[in-house]
């Protein structure tokens, strides 16, 4: 029945990759309300939040142990389930509200396994403001550094936060380069074509190839210096905060 069920949160669970600890909750859900798609949707929404936090915060602590009693006590009341899970995760801190925000705020999101999923959900959020698109696909999906990584041979081009020697400072390298505010979903072919180009050229390519709204909105965060668009710490900070706020609100049990 799960395979045949149609629901956006079921799709989200599958996109995340369903961990073993989630299946017993799904089985119990079908036991209690196999004929109530609304209730199943509510359950999957709760489970997606738990699963996302477990994948984001890949702790050695065992989330399944903490959820076992809640699973045993679950008798079909989703509000009680949600409150019990929220309380338990906040008690254990690892997957609680505060630590979830800390991880979303991390300065090295590039190495997180869920970065594609976060940006994919962010894209859904941007697109749903205008019209509804639940599923979109990008050929050879990759993560683009808007302010580029330093090329192996050559220097960083103009329009970025570089010094007179065309280098990033230590703060930029450690806190800005790999944070979520500087990362974007892009197709592999597009990524290969823009690489280490000046920001003016990169911005033009985003606007010419607006497959994703997150590409089109970069112009809203960019600043102007000497008549040309630039992508520096201030822009990254602003976009970073917007995506972190989106994440805190999206993977929150209280919404």
Model-derived features: where do they sit?
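Aromatic-acidic/polar surface patches that form glycan- and anion
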Residues: 19, 176, 236
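Betabetaalpha-Me/HNH-type nuclease active-site subdomain
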Residues: 76-215
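General "foldedness" signal
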Residues: 27, 40, 57, 61, ...
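Secondary-structure transition/capping motifs at alpha-helix termini
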Residues: 32-38, 129-135, 193, 250-254
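Residue-level marker of positions within ordered structural domains that often coincide
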Residues: 31, 52, 124, 192, ...
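A cross-family structural signal marking well-folded subdomains
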Residues: 1-120, 226
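Short, well-ordered alpha-helical packing segments
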Residues: 27, 44, 48, 140, ...
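C-terminal, well-folded lobe of enzymatic/effector domains
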Residues: 35-45, 49-58, 67, 87-97, ...
């Amino acid at each position: 029945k799960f395979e045949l069920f149609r629901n956006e949160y079921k799709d989200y669970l599958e996109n995340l990759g369903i961990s073993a600890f989630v299946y017993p909750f799904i089985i119990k859900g079908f036991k209690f309300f196999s004929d109530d798609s609304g209730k199943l949707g509510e359950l999957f929404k709760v489970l997606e939040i738990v699963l996302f936090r477990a994948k984001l915060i890949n702790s050695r602590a065992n989330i399944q142990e903490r959820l076992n009693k809640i699973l045993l006590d679950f008798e079909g009341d989703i509000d009680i389930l949600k409150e019990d899970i929220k309380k338990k995760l906040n008690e254990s801190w690892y997957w609680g509200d505060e630590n979830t925000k800390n991880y979303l705020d991390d300065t090295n999101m590039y190495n997180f396994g869920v970065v594609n999923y976060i940006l994919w959900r962010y894209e859904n959020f941007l697109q749903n403001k205008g019209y509804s698109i639940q599923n979109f696909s990008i050929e050879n999906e990759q993560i683009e550094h808007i302010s580029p990584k330093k090329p192996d041979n050559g220097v960083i081009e103009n329009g970025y936060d570089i010094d007179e020697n065309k280098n990033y400072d230590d703060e930029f390298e450690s806190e800005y380069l790999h944070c979520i505010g500087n990362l974007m979903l892009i197709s592999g072919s597009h990524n290969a074509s823009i690489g280490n180009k000046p920001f003016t050229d990169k911005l033009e390519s985003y606007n010419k190839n607006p497959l994703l709204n997150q590409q089109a909105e970069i112009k809203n965060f960019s600043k102007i210096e000497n008549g040309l668009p630039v992508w520096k710490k201030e822009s990254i900070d602003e976009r970073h905060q917007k995506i972190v706020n989106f994440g805190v609100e999206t993977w929150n049990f209280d919404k």
